[in-house]
Amino acid sequence: MYLDQIKAELVEAQDVLNKFISDENNIKLIQEAALLISNSFKQGGKVLSCGNGGSHCDAMHFAEELTGRYRENRPGYPAIAISDASHLSCVSNDFGYEYVFSRYVEAVGQKGDVLFGLSTSGNSKNILNAIEAAKTKGMKVIAMTGKDGGKMAGLADVEIRVPHFRYADRIQEIHIKVIHILMMLIEFEMAKQA
């Protein structure tokens, strides 16, 4: 009944992944992002992660893998997903949803920390504001985007972009793969210090 559609979905997902892998620069950017985060941790910094919708869930997943564990037992790493419901509702009500992440960065971000922002379009105003706040605080910025990078293109220290122009879910599928690779590389890099 749906077998052809199921196969077509999997083939499209595979094609998006293959296109991403075929650009050697993407592989280098993943390594660069992992080293940037690891170096922040080694110097006493932390990661603040943020996103909207499914990307919000990915931001939370990234932070919990850092504070908890990915594959191996090891010390927790300092990471916070900007996801506190009371903060989000307060700032949304009092200032506007476009400031929910930037207000948090202003409050707890420090020089040497890393902002990890996810936006499949690259146009999320609240992520753009968070990037601006992070730069003001002397933080480094890693952006995970899609399509042509949108307004976030060129703003981050490291931008990992999935150049897919149809649906956001295909971009998110690559984002979660990248997140898992980042976790693995961060664990490798931090183990050198132990």
UniProtKB/Swiss-Prot annotation:
Pathway: Carbohydrate biosynthesis; D-glycero-D-manno-heptose 7-phosphate biosynthesis; D-glycero-alpha-D-manno-heptose 7-phosphate and D-glycero-beta-D-manno-heptose 7-phosphate from sedoheptulose 7-phosphate: step 1/1. SUPFAM superfamilies: SIS domain (SSF53697). Keywords: Carbohydrate metabolism, Cytoplasm, Isomerase, Metal-binding, Zinc. One of its GO terms (cellular component) is cytoplasm. Its EC number is 5.3.1.28. Its cofactor is Zn(2+). Substrate binds at N52, G53, G54, E65, N93, D94, S119, T120, S121, S124, Q172. The keyword Metal-binding applies. One of its GO terms (biological process) is carbohydrate metabolic process. Signal peptide: none annotated. This is Phosphoheptose isomerase.
